[in-house]
Amino acid sequence: METKESTMNDQNTHTRSRNKAIPYLPRYMKPGQPCVVCGDDATGLHYRAITCEGCKGFFRRTVQQKIVYKCKSIERCEISKISRNICQFCRFQKCLRNGMTKSLVLNETERIAKRKMIIDNRERRKLEHLRTLLKASSLADKQDEFQSRIDQVTANYCKIMDNSLEYKFKSNKKSERLIELTKLVSQQVRQFAETIEICDTLNPSEKEEIIAKSWLVVKILQIIHEFNPTECCLMLANNTTYIPAKGNYSELDKTTKIFENLINLAISFNCMQLDNRQLALLSALLIYNPENVKRSKEKIDKIHVELWKCLQSISEMHDDDSSDLLHWPNFLVRIPYLILTVSKMQDFFQDENNINAIANILLFKFT
């Protein structure tokens, strides 16, 4: 006979299936089709027989645990929905007579392997679905449509931003040196911004506003690509380098933390292998961001959307012109990381006491 606990399990299983608003029914079954063992409502084909969940579980446990039953009567007990838990021997024999096959019951190792296969297949289907969605929204095949803008922005970026900044400070005062340096770098970013025609439609205060809010992140984007992945070091001014510090980050001084943040950004972007087109377009996007202005948001947003489309179209393609749908999402998640990290550095780059470190980061050479 089955234990009280087993009886409760069978009843609970039956109750759960009954409580569902629309019980799942395989296409090969008819509504109300009975279990061939006990007559309860069947749920499907289990081990080659149409059975209920209770008889399926009973048969599986019996085979897996190699349980041997004995009948207290003459081995002819009636097995029904009500009496199925009275004699386990006769219930198991009826399972066998009605086609349930012991060889189809998986052992623990086989069950784990099957569960893993199901999970892997589910993840594969999710990935295929994601790839389908990405492909549907892909702009890779529209690159020709944006080529003129891409070429224009890239050429101007290389012409202006690739010029190494060398500077001889005029003052010995830290505060004045910081002003000199800020003007120098922001002027370079301004020159690049002015090559995009929308700049001509902005008034002077709006121009200053977008440069003031973007020059640092644009320059940092450029700096972190002066990264040597082989040596894992950042190339700095006056032929110096920065190698990652050892020890606990929380125990580092303020300046070292800034360099560590730059290294982390560099490592994150290095795996993306961005080319000049992507750097140029992303820099333009960082400048012409609607969040950088209080007014003219609609005007800025128009060029912002166009630049996004240009960047997406080239970021979805490999160098060999084959499609790479996952490169764009991976690129996208790094952009807010860049913006957030640089925003946390603002105070450091506005502190005159950090002028030497700031010059080391932003300039190619200085005296």
From Swiss-Prot:
A zinc finger (NR C4-type) spans 35-55, 71-95. One of its GO terms (cellular component) is RNA polymerase II transcription regulator complex. GO terms for molecular function: nuclear receptor activity; RNA polymerase II cis-regulatory region sequence-specific DNA binding; zinc ion binding. Belongs to the nuclear hormone receptor family. Keywords: DNA-binding, Metal-binding, Nucleus, Receptor, Transcription, Transcription regulation, Zinc, Zinc-finger. The lineage of its organism: Eukaryota, Metazoa, Ecdysozoa, Nematoda, Chromadorea. The gene is nhr-1. It comes from Onchocerca volvulus. This is Nuclear hormone receptor-like 1. Pfam families: zf-C4 (PF00105).
